[in-house]
Amino acid sequence: MNRRDFIKTALAAAAGGALTGGLRFSGARAAEAASTGGGGKKKVLIITGSPRAHGNSNTLADEFTRGARETGHEVVRFDAGLKNVRPCTACNHCGMQGPCILDDDDFPFVREHIATAQAVLFVSPVYYYTISAQIKAVIDRFYAINGTVHARKRSAFILTLANSDMERVQPIIDYFRKGLYDYLGWEYAGHVVGTGLWPVGAVNGSRFMDEAYRLGRNI
């Protein structure tokens, strides 16, 4: 599938995906979904997208990390919201698998570790009912390592938002499950959607902390 076909597939999934099982797999059932087929120790790359170092989504990433490490997994983390990752300029210099003219920023860390990771976790706050610009910039830069990321991997995602309307979150769930994962050939390993989280620290003591922890244990 070329770049244009991928974009069309992802947009179609985001815009028109039916409200199916993905909605029901948020929260506690995410850990159950992740428990199937996830045996063995793994290298897990976490990519977060919040510009707030101690925001709610990053706190859930911490809990996921705790669960994963307690199970014996190696965890490597890239906080895109606190790094310098420039957006893809569509120059095609890389030819979908090669040197990127922007690789003097922080993206080479992702390039290095995603090649050897058996699992990837995406963590993002929801801004205007989509993922953050910071994490989207990382995903778009996958174009330069398109062959590398087309490999057998498990992947999960964590989303946080102030609203509690799950129907509005479904297009993001579809983007990951029906768009990105289908294109890359990655195995879906579960997700957590933390709703009703507005101020920093709102997630502390919530059920989402345990759900993120168990997702990490079962990645």
Set out the residue ranges of the language-model regions.
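Short histidine/acidic/glycine/proline-rich micro-motifs that form metal-
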Residues: 51-54, 126-129, 162-166, 197-200
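Residues within the helices of the helix-turn-helix
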Residues: 4
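Short, glycine-/small-residue-rich phosphate/pyrophosphate-handling segment
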Residues: 150-188
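N-terminal beta1-alpha1-beta2 submodule of the flavodoxin-like/Rossmannoid cofactor-binding fold
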Residues: 7, 11-123, 129-145, 204-219
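Glycine-rich phosphate/pyrophosphate-binding loop and the adjoining helix
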Residues: 180-219
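Hydrophobic/aromatic beta-strand patches that form the interior of the parallel beta-sheet core
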Residues: 45-47, 76-78, 156-159, 189-192
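Short, solvent-exposed coil/turn elements at secondary-structure transition points
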Residues: 81-83, 161, 194-197
